[in-house]
Amino acid sequence: MMMPANYSVIAENEMTYVNGGANFIDAIGAVTAPIWTLDNVKTFNTNIVTLVGNTFLQSTINRTIGVLFSGNTTWKEVGNIGKNLFGTNVKGNPIEKNNFGDYAMNALGIAAAVYNLGVAPTKNTVKETEVKFTV
């Protein structure tokens, strides 16, 4: 069978490039599709959430439970928990007004920290060490 002069046999993912350019996601997908399974993607996403949550965990605890159990809690401090939690970044610096990106990333970090508290057991000092009583 004779093919037209402008016809060539190429793969479908290359045809995307001919028709207007391959995008980055298609290129990564073509390379990683044989390697990454659904389990790999799930593990990767879980690990990212865990890393972000670990970064925000201590500051989230300090700005919520730490305020309540500090020993010198006032109602004003309790009322400011939300402002301090969502208005300051993980380093404790205030987030600039109208900086939606930082507010959103801060909220996602706090959500990841709460997720970590919900899915993994915390270290129990009493369980892992010997507690001695002296009389």
Swiss-Prot record:
User: What domain of life does the native source organism fall in?
Assistant: Bacteria
Task: Give start-end of the signal peptide.
Answer: none
Cellular component, GO, one term:
extracellular region
- Keywords tagged on the record: Secreted
| Localization terms from the record | Secreted
Additional remarks: Crohn disease is an inflammatory bowel disease. This commensal, butyrate-producing bacterium, isolated from a human fecal sample, is reduced in some patients suffering from Crohn disease. In a mouse model of diabetes mellitus there is a significantly reduced population of Faecalibacterium.
Instruction: Give the protein's function.
Output: Plays an anti-inflammatory role in the mammalian intestine. The supernatant of this bacteria, or 2 purified fractions containing peptides derived from this protein, exerts inhibitory effects on IL1-beta-induced IL-8 secretion in intestinal epithelial CaCO-2 cells. Mice fed this bacterium suffer less severe symptoms in 2,4,6-trinitrobenzenesulphonic acid (TNBS)-induced colitis. Expression in human epithelial cell lines (HEK293T, HT29) shows a decrease in activation of NF-kappa-B induced by Carma-1 (CARD11) or lipopolysaccharide. The decrease occurs in a MAM-dose dependent manner.
Q: What is this protein called?
A: Microbial anti-inflammatory molecule
The protein's induction, as recorded, is: Transcribed in the gut of mice with diabetes mellitus (db/db mice).
